[in-house]
């Protein structure tokens, strides 16, 4: 079994809901047993954290996001990266690159930063926001210049409390779902919750 097989089956809706829940539980366990490292490729990596978070494993998704060792996004940052590399270990021990140091593939995590961590989902003119804050990250904020205008979603921890900020463009209302179950409908403008 590989993580990618489970990610694709869930993300591409190839399973029923009960099967997806069971597959997500197995996927979560696989990631944990792999030291919270991913072993997915180009097709599955963009969906991994989203699938985990959707089925109640956001804590594991955050551990993947913040993994300091290879394979992991922060490994590159720890080595001085200012771009996303083509491979997880894009430089050798002497700092010499052996592949592209500016490559789109693993940058796919940005989709989850916008759509999961900050919760911005804008599809066919409809906007929903459902942020997924986690204490392992003190704060997050995303700004998306959509066809409807600028959308902002952010959150910040203050102790155990989370403060949210939202910016909604003109002529658009948005349904916001907070992790505690609160549902809000926000009109255009800036909002703090």
Residue ranges and their predicted role:
Residues 7-18, 47-55, 115-119:
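Well-ordered alpha-helical scaffold segments within catalytic/enzyme domains
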Residues 59-193:
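Non-catalytic C-terminal accessory modules of carbohydrate-active enzymes
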Residues 39-51, 174:
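Amphipathic alpha-helical protein-interaction segments enriched in hydrophobic
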Residues 4, 43, 56, 104, ...:
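Conserved active-site and cofactor/substrate-binding residues in soluble primary-metabolism enzymes
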Residues 1-43, 63, 67-70, 74, ...:
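Extended glycan-interaction surfaces of carbohydrate-active proteins
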